Amino acid sequence: MATNGSASSAQLSQKEADVRMMCAAEVHLGTKNCNYQMERYVFKRRNDGIYIFNLGKTWEKLQMAARVIVAIENPQDIIVQSARPYGQRAVLKFAQYTGANAIAGRHTPGTFTNQMQTSFSEPRLLILTDPRTDHQPIKEGALGNIPIIAFCDTDSPMRFVDIGIPANNKGKHSIGCLFWLLARMVLQMRGTIAAGQKWDVMVDLFFYREPEETKPEDEDEAGPQAEYGALPAPEYGMVGGDQWTTAQIPDAAWPGEGQAPISAAPAAASWSDSAAAPADGGWEAAAPPSGAPAAGWE
């Protein structure tokens, strides 16, 4: 009797710790709309209209989903998928620790129904992040009689979903916390982790990371860049050394200021005068026209 009591108390303490973690990750926050099939999992409604989940029922549904996952002999027959960006990292981490296959990103239509595709697969279980964003794999899984486990919010459609886990499936912390708890429960049921032993993997590894967080690290690895003012000035005299020179041009090489200006050619007496004085500077006068000048306008 004492052994059973200690085991139940340890399980209760673990459940309390998991509920506190889910509460810190805002798993209990729903939306302002509630589907009639999700009303049984709602604890209350706040004054601002947000529905609050009963995290005790969420923990029980996680246990049920973990039992279904463990019942499948080959983990490669399980596909965990997320089209939502906040769940893609959590999906990859869950597949890494449980041995399942992960599809992070957009679902290619026909993956579960079209045998002509190279990416065709027939999984025995499908785990999804959001039934609304992952509606295409739900439809294909229903056509192929594939059991579906999904994290469902208060406004999520429950059609073709076999096991709906009531939780917040829109927050980056809540999605990571849910997949971390599900992965730990699966490993505990498989015997990889002892029942009372703490899992070494931190829940932070399942959280979504912003792309800007890795940018300063790349800059530090590249090394400090030289400032613009610290760069050496280019030596213009070295460009084209065969043709250019840096020596100063003497003043004698420039034309003098006292040089006589070029005089203009004298104007002809009339338009008919063909013999005009040549212009100075070697310019020759233009040849006169061959025909006789016209006397007037005709």
Swiss-Prot record:
Subcellular location: Cytoplasm
PANTHER family: 40S RIBOSOMAL PROTEIN SA
Cross-referenced InterPro entries: Ribosomal_uS2, Ribosomal_uS2_CS, Ribosomal_uS2_euk, Ribosomal_uS2_euk/arc, Ribosomal_uS2_flav_dom_sf
Skewed-composition ranges (Low complexity): 263-298
Region described as Disordered: spans on this chain: 252-298
Biological process, per Gene Ontology: response to osmotic stress; response to salt stress; ribosomal small subunit assembly; translation
A single GO cellular-component term on record: nucleus
Pfam annotation, one family: Ribosomal_S2
Family per similarity comment: Belongs to the universal ribosomal protein uS2 family.
Domain of life: Eukaryota
Keyword entries, A-Z: Acetylation, Cytoplasm, Ribonucleoprotein, Ribosomal protein
Modified residues (N-acetylalanine): A2
GO molecular function: mRNA binding; structural constituent of ribosome
Recorded coiled-coil stretches: none
Protein name: Small ribosomal subunit protein uS2z
Quaternary organization: Component of the small ribosomal subunit. Mature ribosomes consist of a small (40S) and a large (60S) subunit. The 40S subunit contains about 33 different proteins and 1 molecule of RNA (18S). The 60S subunit contains about 49 different proteins and 3 molecules of RNA (25S, 5.8S and 5S). Interacts with ribosomal protein S21.
Annotated function: Required for the assembly and/or stability of the 40S ribosomal subunit. Required for the processing of the 20S rRNA-precursor to mature 18S rRNA in a late step of the maturation of 40S ribosomal subunits.
